[in-house]
Structures are given as C-alpha cells and as structure tokens.
Amino acid sequence: MEAGTRTPTPVLSFGEPSIDGCFPGGGLPLGGWHEVTGAGLEDETGAAPAAFVTQLIRGLTDRKGGAVVWVARRADLFAPGLLGLGFPAARLIQVRARDEAETLSLLEDALSTQGVAAAVAEAEAPDLTAGRRLQLACEKRGGFGVVLHRRPYGGRAGGKPRLVSGSASFSRWRIAPAPSGPPPDDIGLGPPRWRVELERCRGGRPGGWILQAQEAGHGPHPFRLVSQLADHDVAAAEAGRRFG
C-alpha cells in the first residue's frame, strides 16, 4: 500500500444521483452520526422521522446484518409499524433511558459495541462535547448513529425547545409526512411517503425530495424518488420555520 493512501469511507447509497450527489462520498457515510428532526408537530411526536429512520436503517441491515439498538425515554415505538415497513424487528434491541444524559451515554456505548450495525437515540439536543464523543464511538467500529430529535413530553418548561447545535454530526435532516399515492390495485393507501430535507451535510450540499418507502424485496435501496423539491420550496420552508 502506498504511503498516504486512505481507504474510502463506506457509504449507504440511496440509488438516486440527485440524492447521492449531495454527499462528498456519493452516499450517506457510515462511521458517523446524523441528526433527524420533524417539522411542526412531528418535532414532538416523532412519527414521520422515526419511520424515515427505520426505512434508512433497513437498507443498512439488509447490507451489513447486525443488531439495531434504539434508545428512548418513551415506550411508544410501535413494533407492528416497523414490521409494516419491512424492518427486521428480530434484530431490534429497545432500551429505556431515564433522562437525556443516560440516553446519550447508552447511544455512545451501543455505537462502540461489536455486532451493532446501527444505533438510534431519541434525544432533545446533544451539546458539542456529547456530539464529539458520539463521533469517536462511530469511528471505533464504523457504526452508524442517529439522534432522533424529540421534545420531551410536550416541550421544555418555559416555552421553546432547546436549539440543536448540530455542529458535530455529519448531516441534519428534517422530515414531514407527504400524501401517499394510489396503490397498484387502487385499494387502500399506497406506500408511505415523506417530505425529506437535507438541511446540512459536511462537505456536501443541501437538498429536498419527496421519497416513498420501497417495499422489502423490491430492490436494494430503501426509498424510491417521487420528486425533487425545487430550491425555492426548501428555502421557503426554512424561512417559515425561522420567522413563523
């Protein structure tokens, strides 16, 4: 091996150039942690962001195998819903935490553990020190970490939720539900869809899309691109959150 050469960082590809091209390595890198938050009420309920994360991790476990650790302070992770998205629930390890500090500590431990493909923690806002510790844990074994931002039980006393630093994570996403299309047989609802905004990416660029869950066994990638959001749509949504 020549001196100075580096092994390329493994990535999780979305299978869509318009998405993968936002990342410097051509896909969402492993060996790092990412922030996912909701828009509007989803900031508290976390339903759409959790479904998006579940779908994302399904693509990773299909490729790597291994366990998935999910750390939360609430007992509202709905296992049948995970199965409906094709998530391998047999690989799921659920852990209840008492407070924010324990949540982040458990996430760090999970990311440092051999045999864990991915770890998710429902937390409000890790500070810079906690974020750096999470990154070191990811680098130790090439783990994939997600901090799913949720306000604790209706928000913090005194009003607005604490702002997210986001400075130590590789990327930050904002997720909202989107109307489903008709199913192939025109009966019931089609696969779930999400409005997905990549707000920040280290060394990359932001973007926005409507993505649909790809059914298990229908391809190597967990999502299907429905449409790409125009730049002005993403900018308008960001301005509305900032000044609304």
From Swiss-Prot:
Induction conditions: Up-regulated in response to DNA damage in a RecA-dependent manner.
Keywords noted in UniProt: DNA damage, DNA repair
State the Gene Ontology BP annotations.
Answer: DNA repair
DNA damage: present as a keyword of the record?
yes
Q: Which residues form a coiled coil?
A: none
Question: What does this protein's UniProt record list under function?
Answer: Along with DnaE2 and ImuB is required for the error-prone processing of DNA lesions.
Name of the protein in question: Protein ImuA
Identify the species of origin: Caulobacter vibrioides (strain NA1000 / CB15N)
Q: Which gene encodes it?
A: imuA
